[in-house]
Amino acid sequence: MLIIAIVFYGLRWKGISKSLIESTLVNSMIMFIIVGAYFFTYMIGSANIATKLHDVVVNFGLSPWQVILSINIILLVLGCLIDPLTITLLTVPIFVPLIIQIGYNPIWFGVVFVINTEIGLITPPMGINLFAIKTVFNISTGELLKGVTPFLMIEIVFLALICAFPALSLWLPGTMIGG
């Protein structure tokens, strides 16, 4: 980004100071999110939320597939509204213990989680990658949505395949570990 700024706009002290101020503000917001997520995680651990969530799942008689479908829906909705870092910090402490307790592989869930957040990056209204593409290429929102829709559909099909056939995402890590 720095090289692009230098090539296209030149390097001036006014631009550097503005960039430093903006990056400081962005980093401050990120640090507040991380600190808030740390306290949120601590409260979740202290309140034993993961165990209580597991008990709710058992009491409702939800099958593991219904649980993962519910988690996928929650992550997709959150991906439309919140950035991936915040989603990760807020949901991982809740979902990972539940996933392990119902018998899913945590590596597989990690892949499913990343695919969900990738989908969130290209899903309106909060898709961060959409804002970046719209800004860089100066295209209309309609044109952008028309261009991203096929990729969004492919990602959703890919997510469904990974959920239906976990071996697709576990084969490579298994060969790396030697299993």
Regions found by a protein language model. Give the residues of each.
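Alpha-helical transmembrane segments of multi-pass membrane transport proteins
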Residues: 1-179
